[in-house]
Amino acid sequence: MGPEAQEVFFKATDDQLSQAEVYDFMRPVFGKNVVYDASKKNRQVQFQTMANGLRTARLKAYVSKIEEETRMYLKNWGESGEVDLLTALSELTILTASRCLHGEDVRTHIFKEVQELYHDLDHGLTPLTVFWPNAPTEAHRKRNKARTEMVELFQKVIKERELYPDRSDGTDILSLFMQIKYKDGSKITADQVTGLLIALLFAGQHTSCISSTWTSLFVSHDKSLLDRVRKEQDEILGKSKRPIQFEDVQKMDLLHNCMREALRMCPTFIMILRKAEQDLKVKSEGKTFIIPKGDIVVVSPTVSMRMKETFPNPDTYDPDRYAAPREEHKKPYSYLGFGGGVHSCMGQNFAFLQVKTILSVLLREYDIDRIEPGMPDIGYEDMVVGPKGNCRVKYQKR
């Protein structure tokens, strides 16, 4: 445990530490020949295409879409009221993700169906799934049905786009996935395209909605920090309500560090898993250990990022720990909010962009106070770790 011991985990190649076997339980959700079920060559093509779709040139086109979706959603709040913040931000993050990743046609015409099917896919992932992915349960039955229907939906979208290519602006990732050709010359199938879209949504949805919820709660709970965040927003955007630009989001350093700190204290995944494909030597605190071939290797962001040796006063929410001169995250393999090394999350730039744009609008336009005193507990009993219980807040338009 700790940065030194974790170095071998995050520097290892797939030939040394494999993800495929330990995440095999996701195959019924993602589908065959998708991500970890694909051959190594095809998986590289899929991952490279994902990475291309999340580069700066495309991210620049997403800011206006995320802001527009956020403002449309918040119109329904009115001047004041109460809401479960986690539920609200979960709805908002999937709206913005669908607009950016799936495209305008999906968001406009079939979003409700996609959202309902995603719900059944998500709830088809239970603790039992890890050990028995195809157990004859109601959750798994709904999961399998939802995936079949999701493929049918996107098959129609793909056919429409092939017939009428001008209807898409080409900035969404679905457009990129449709163009995938593997090194053997074969073309990607609609089933695989759907699986990649599901995988991308799975990877980002929980992290974005949970981190935006925790960030909102932590910042709103500390009035002096909230004042600083709003001051930063005013310095970047001014008092006018001009549209947010990509360059504006890049300047939101304090808000960035607030999200980063929320993920340090409350990471969405307790464990990251690998299977040792060969014996591996690990050094820690002057000692050397051997991880035998065949063992399951685990790194826990939850434990590692609360180590006082790496992050002093680890139980204190302190976004300034990332700013100069402290920069406590700079030590390699210490900050694991988005994994690390060769398999660090390729969607982290999109996640920061999405959450910062949403919170820029939300925190400038609303005062938020949690109805119950203090901060919620962390729900460690869940597969994906978020706030425990409800997150009901009172809001008042500023």
Model region roles, listed by residue range:
Residues 384-398:
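C-terminal helix/juxtamembrane-tail motif
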Residues 18-27, 60-212, 246:
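Cytochrome P450 heme-thiolate monooxygenase catalytic core
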Residues 1-3, 7-9, 105-112, 206-231, ...:
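Classical protein tyrosine phosphatase
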Residues 299-327:
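Conserved cytochrome P450 K-helix/beta-meander segment immediately N-terminal to the heme-binding cysteine loop
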Residues 152, 156, 242-285, 298, ...:
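Conserved cytochrome P450 K-helix E-x-x-R motif and the immediately C-terminal K′/meander segment
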Residues 223-225, 348-385:
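Cytochrome P450 heme-binding "Cys pocket" and the immediately downstream C-terminal segment
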Residues 52, 247, 324-355, 379-382, ...:
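Cytochrome P450 heme-thiolate "Cys pocket" and heme-binding signature region
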Residues 1-32, 36, 40-41, 45, ...:
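N-terminal membrane-proximal hinge/A-helix region immediately C-terminal to the signal-anchor transmembrane segment
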